């Protein structure tokens, strides 16, 4: 199914927060394979964090909406719910940051994530002039890291600790959480 893309506006913030939470936390997230429910409790993000992305220069929240949602799981899903989203941020040195990547849990594994990632890479390269896309992923998410590696990302060797003690980022269920940085060159991808 094809996706239509647009950038989030302030009115979209509640729906974006709900989508991100459903993809990563709680029992509902177990419908997809991106769940962090075994690693973290609490929130994944909040309205203030998403609003900051929407309002800040050089940052954007890309939204994906399914075109002709004829196969919606319920009528409510066909009526204005998001298929997925991701944060894009222009950084110095021709780099773009990719984060808060979420796909509706009941629709994961159907190619929507690949479409969203490809559009984010295109925007970063063509509209932001980025030569490289970078992201942070929980080191304990081996299956997710492998998914990104199959799409051309590689580990940079950089890591940072999880922000323990700050419930805004979730409540850890284990003491060894950390993030690894992944990177992918965006230039020269479509030369042929």
What would you call each of these model-derived segments?
Residues 44-63, 175-178:
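A short helix-loop-beta-strand connector motif used in the catalytic cores of GNAT acetyltransferases and
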């Amino acid at each position: 199914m094809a996706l239509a893309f647009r950038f989030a506006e302030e009115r979209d913030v509640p729906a974006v927060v709900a989508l991100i939470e459903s993809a990563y936390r709680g029992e509902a997230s177990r419908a997809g394979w991106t769940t962090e429910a075994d690693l973290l409790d609490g929130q994944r993000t909040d309205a203030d964090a998403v609003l900051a992305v929407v309002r800040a220069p050089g940052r954007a929240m890309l939204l994906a909406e399914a075109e002709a949602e004829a196969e919606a799981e319920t009528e409510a899903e066909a009526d204005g719910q998001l298929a997925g989203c991701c944060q894009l941020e222009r950084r110095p040195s021709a780099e773009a940051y990719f984060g808060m990547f979420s796909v509706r849990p009941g629709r994961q594994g159907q190619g929507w994530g690949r479409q969203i990632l490809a559009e984010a890479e295109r925007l970063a390269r063509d509209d932001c002039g980025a030569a490289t896309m970078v992201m942070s992923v929980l080191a304990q998410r081996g299956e997710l890291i492998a998914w990104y590696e199959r799409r051309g990302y590689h580990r940079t060797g950089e890591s940072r600790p999880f922000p323990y003690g700050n419930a805004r980022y979730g409540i850890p269920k284990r003491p060894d959480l950390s993030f690894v940085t992944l990177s992918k060159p965006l230039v020269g991808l479509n030369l042929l």
